[in-house]
């Protein structure tokens, strides 16, 4: 039974007759290999979420053990550089503000170092707010409106739309229903829960000259 290989802090792996070299990026602050990672498998290791970048760990990059003092020869099929299975995605703690590690990973979602997402890698870091894929709630800036909750993986238009905002105050134009006591002979002030119509409306029960006896 093959033993599990470990990456050393220097990025080199060793076990028996095979030796694997772990890819270390140019930035010294990012280390793609750790002592609890197996070198015989492909790992996708994220960098800090501050720059929203995932780096592909090119370990294993398999070399045959040198014979008779000859330099090692690189095998043709021992190099990975595009994607890896979600089984081997190993997240680090996200250091960026407003991000937390995701609980699960989507297969084939690991990105190479050259890919720079605008917001974040959705399979690795989630924002603290429940909005995914850079979605933001509608910003209803006009008075008397408030935004509806924005669901996950759904984007709202930037402008105010009828299904995106609910009126929270009185509309400043047009009268609402006016309640007038039917048996009153004097006009009453219109009442509509605080909203005043734009045009004064008087009651329909105003007395006429004939109703007053023409006196």
Swiss-Prot record:
InterPro entries, per the entry: Keratin_matx, KRTAP_PMG
GO molecular function terms listed in the Swiss-Prot or TrEMBL record: structural molecule activity
Any Pfam family matching the protein: PMG
Family in the record: Belongs to the PMG family.
Physiological role: In the hair cortex, hair keratin intermediate filaments are embedded in an interfilamentous matrix, consisting of hair keratin-associated proteins (KRTAP), which are essential for the formation of a rigid and resistant hair shaft through their extensive disulfide bond cross-linking with abundant cysteine residues of hair keratins. The matrix proteins include the high-sulfur and high-glycine-tyrosine keratins.
Subunit structure, as described in the record: Interacts with hair keratins.
Record-given protein name: Keratin-associated protein 26-1
UniProt organism field: Mus musculus
Lineage, uppermost ranks: Eukaryota, Metazoa, Chordata, Craniata, Vertebrata
